[in-house]
Regions:
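Low-complexity, intrinsically disordered short segments enriched for Gly/Pro and polybasic residues
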Residues: 15-16, 21, 168, 216-220
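Detector for outer-membrane/organellar transmembrane beta-barrel domains
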Residues: 191-271, 279-280
Length: 322
């Protein structure tokens, strides 16, 4: 199949997510801003469709330096946003990525996540993502969907090319999340809001040849959020209904030219009286056979979810990039 047809077909399907999200802003200034961003994104996709050749070639950045699309759609690891801009576009190029990921916990919860991101000139990122959370026997045959629209801006440094100093690449980001099933389960267990906005700052540095000649990537985040279980159980709670500052960390080692192994840790708030929420962590292995494709397998520990303790899962993600 022609790479462009596949890639942009996925992107046009994902644009429907944005249409649902911005309905909650009907008539507001925020909606006008979203509509402008969406129009710009559609123009970008159409331009690539018109002028793209049958053989897609990725941008000129180094392999893996766009990361992968994380749970909420930003470029990064599986759990955490990184300061890296998605795709492989340089400061003169536009990069794009689309992915699909699936996990099933030992308690039967299912997580399906898909979305795409566009990186503009290695400076600005726009992402769209939808996550579906299957409730298994907690509420049989039911699921909760969450839509996320995110933006990220690189404000300082270059994670790859600033090797002569200690300064990392630094980016700030915002993620607007809309829980489509709020009145069904989240509200009943004590969640206060159907939508929320997360703010984060990320610092990422790639150390070339740091460990026995292997490249080492380190990342740290600070996130301001009210989300319960990333937003899948709504925002705020009957215990706490204010923003908390939550740190997160990632480390990855490049075993060879196209294989990364790493770990992540993400702290989370604990807002609902009756539902204890634990921090999330993972161990991951990502294979980059080319710039256009990556496959990630991970073991995730999500701790307590709703009425089930010690929830762990194997996670599999596929991504195409340009």
């Amino acid at each position: 199949m022609n790479f462009y047809k596949l890639f942009f077909g996925i992107n046009f399907c994902c644009l429907q997510i944005i249409s649902r999200v911005i309905k909650s802003f009907q008539g507001s200034t925020t909606m006008k801003i979203f509509e402008f961003l969406i129009s710009s994104l559609r123009l970008t996709v159409l331009t690539c469709l018109i002028f793209g050749s049958g053989q897609a070639s990725a941008g000129d950045r180094l392999l893996a330096t766009g990361g992968v699309i994380q749970l909420e759609g930003a470029g990064g690891g599986g759990l955490n946003p990184w300061a890296l801009i998605t795709g492989y576009g340089t400061d003169e190029q536009i990069g794009l990525s689309a992915n699909y990921a699936k996990a099933r916990t030992n308690g039967g919860y299912e997580i399906d996540s898909g979305g795409f991101g566009v990186g503009f000139y290695n400076r600005f990122e726009l992402s769209v993502n939808q996550t579906k959370f299957g409730l298994n026997n907690t509420v049989p045959h039911e699921s909760i969907e969450m839509d996320t629209v995110g933006v990220k801006l690189r404000i300082l440094g270059d994670a790859v090319y600033d090797q002569d100093n200690w300064i990392p690449q630094v980016a700030v980001g915002v993620q607007y999340k809309k829980n489509e099933g709020f009145s069904f389960v989240p509200k009943l267990v004590g969640s206060q809001h159907s939508n929320g906005i997360d703010f984060y700052i990320a610092a990422t540095k790639l150390y070339l040849g740091a460990i026995y000649g292997r490249n080492l990537l380190l990342n740290a985040n600070l996130q301001a959020t009210k989300a319960n279980q990333f937003g899948l159980l709504g925002f705020g709670g009957d215990k706490h209904d204010s923003y908390s500052i939550n740190p997160a960390f990632s480390a990855a080692l490049m075993l060879n030219d196209n294989l990364f192994i790493g770990a992540e840790y993400r702290t989370k708030p604990n807002n609902i009286k009756t539902l204890k929420e634990d921090d999330a962590k993972d161990l991951f292995l990502t294979w980059f056979p080319s710039k256009n494709l990556s496959i990630t397998s991970a073991y995730i520990d999500l701790g307590n979810i709703a009425n089930k303790n010690n929830q762990t899962a194997w996670y599999l993600s596929g991504q195409i990039s340009y």
